[in-house]
From Swiss-Prot:
Pfam families: SepSecS
Reactions this protein catalyses: O-phospho-L-seryl-tRNA(Cys) + hydrogen sulfide + H(+) = L-cysteinyl-tRNA(Cys) + phosphate
Organism: Methanococcus maripaludis (strain DSM 14266 / JCM 13030 / NBRC 101832 / S2 / LL)
Cofactor: pyridoxal 5'-phosphate
GO terms for MF: Sep-tRNA:Cys-tRNA synthase activity
EC number of the protein: 2.5.1.73
Name of the protein in question: O-phospho-L-seryl-tRNA:Cys-tRNA synthase
Keywords from the named record: Protein biosynthesis, Pyridoxal phosphate, Transferase
Top class in the EC scheme: transferase
Superkingdom to which the source organism belongs: Archaea
Subunit structure: Homodimer. Interacts with SepRS.
Signal peptide range in chain numbering: none
Modified sites of kind N6-(pyridoxal phosphate)lysine: K218
Known function: Converts O-phospho-L-seryl-tRNA(Cys) (Sep-tRNA(Cys)) to L-cysteinyl-tRNA(Cys) (Cys-tRNA(Cys)).
């Protein structure tokens, strides 16, 4: 067999070690030092299963069972299971409580994985309305309108889904309003918290939520792939139904899910998560400072104002103007940031970009702001 494996040796990544990373999909998943230590203990395959009696969520050493109970308290829910990510959590709900052909009513900012999950579960969807440019906020009242429309058409509704914080604009949806609508209409309510649980405080019961889909690698300082599904006890029998062949194994989990470093890294980061969500107001202060400092340069923040989440989306006509005369064209901004030790902005993009300063120190935030100012002022 003629295979050269040299390219797979000594693979390295220096973005986090040597640069300030502004990628919003990565800021919430950065591991604290104490969580990195656990990797050396559990990097072998199935090492988490040393003392397993057949179910991942029941393992006592390491204390996965206690961790899941504590995570339920943290999220304000009753029962929690580990998954491989928020998308798998959403699919588990759809595939268990909905019938083939049912409709999922979901927001206009829903992540593509919500559509992939419902399509895989052989479901239909009805998308609710959002505000127009430049805010793009979810309109809660549209849920009631779409539900009424489907009911009038004799269509079966299986689930109401809301994206708590969308990845395009970083808008925080009004969960309580949508939750009240779902409850009054009598439909189960799933909240996609991929960009919120672990970054900001969440209380599922206060929000009238039946299910929470969370992402460990996106927002809970965990290695990927890792996620969580938290549910209300009311749906335990449906969502956590066990196999007829192997009565221990839960069908929607395919027996066991995150069985290695990802779940252990999430456990090791739990104390860090508990503490950091208490400082959410400070994160918003840093985010709003970035917007306030950069908009006078010719940036325009898209989405709700003031910012209620760390994701920032800027339209940047000033960068487009510079790109027209710079010999590096659209790559100049990426290269100038890289010179200054800043990464995470997509290469070749000048019309708009997304960023986040979540978890950065105030000194780092000021450095990012001043670096962008210097780039614009030097090249405009």
């Amino acid at each position: 067999m003629d295979i050269n494996t040299d390219k797979y040796k000594n693979i390295t990544r220096n973005l986090e070690r040597e640069m300030i990373n502004l990628n919003p999909i990565q800021r919430g998943g950065i591991l604290p030092t104490e969580s990195k230590k656990i990797i050396y203990e559990y990097w072998d395959g199935y090492s988490v299963c040393d003392y397993c009696s057949g179910r991942l969520d029941q393992i006592e050493t390491p204390p996965i069972n206690e961790f899941l109970e504590d995570m339920s308290k943290f999220l304000g829910m009753d029962i929690t299971r580990p998954t491989h990510g928020a998308r798998e959590s959403k699919y588990a709900v759809m595939n268990s409580i909905c019938k083939e052909g049912d409709y999922v009513v979901l927001d206009g900012n829903a992540h593509y994985t919500s559509y992939v999950a419902l399509e895989r579960a052989k479901l239909n969807y009805e998308k609710t309305d959002i505000e127009e440019y430049p805010t793009f906020r979810v309109i809660p009242e549209s849920y009631a309108e779409k539900i009424d429309m489907l009911e009038d058409s004799k269509k079966n509704i299986g689930l109401i889904l809301l994206t708590h914080v969308d990845g395009n604009y970083g808008n925080v949806a009004d969960v309580e309003k949508v939750g009240k609508i779902a409850k009054s209409k009598g439909y189960p309510f799933l909240l996609n918290c991929a960009y919120s649980a672990g970054r900001m405080p969440i209380d599922g019961k206060k929000l009238n939520v039946d299910f929470i889909a969370a992402s460990g690698h996106k927002s809970m300082a965990a290695s990927g792939p890792c996620g969580l599904l938290s549910i209300n006890k009311k749906y335990e029998n449906e969502v956590l139904e066990t196999s007829k062949v192997n009565v221990l194994k839960e069908l929607q989990m395919l027996g066991c899910t995150s069985r290695g470093i990802p779940i252990l890294s999430l456990m090791a980061s739990f104390e860090h998560l508990i503490e950091r969500v208490k400082k959410w107001d400070l994160e918003l202060e840093k985010t709003r400072k970035v917007v306030n400092e950069l908009e006078p340069l010719g940036f325009k923040q898209i989405g709700e104002k003031p910012r209620n989440h760390d994701i920032i989306r800027f339209e940047t006509p000033i960068l487009d103007e510079i790109a027209e005369k710079d010999k590096r064209r659209g790559f100049f901004f990426y290269e100038e940031l890289k010179k200054r030790g800043i990464g995470g902005i997509r290469r070749g993009v000048t019309k708009e970009f997304k960023m986040s300063v979540y978890g950065l120190t105030n000194t780092q935030v000021d450095y990012v702001i001043n670096s962008m100012k210097s780039i614009i002022n030097e090249l405009r």
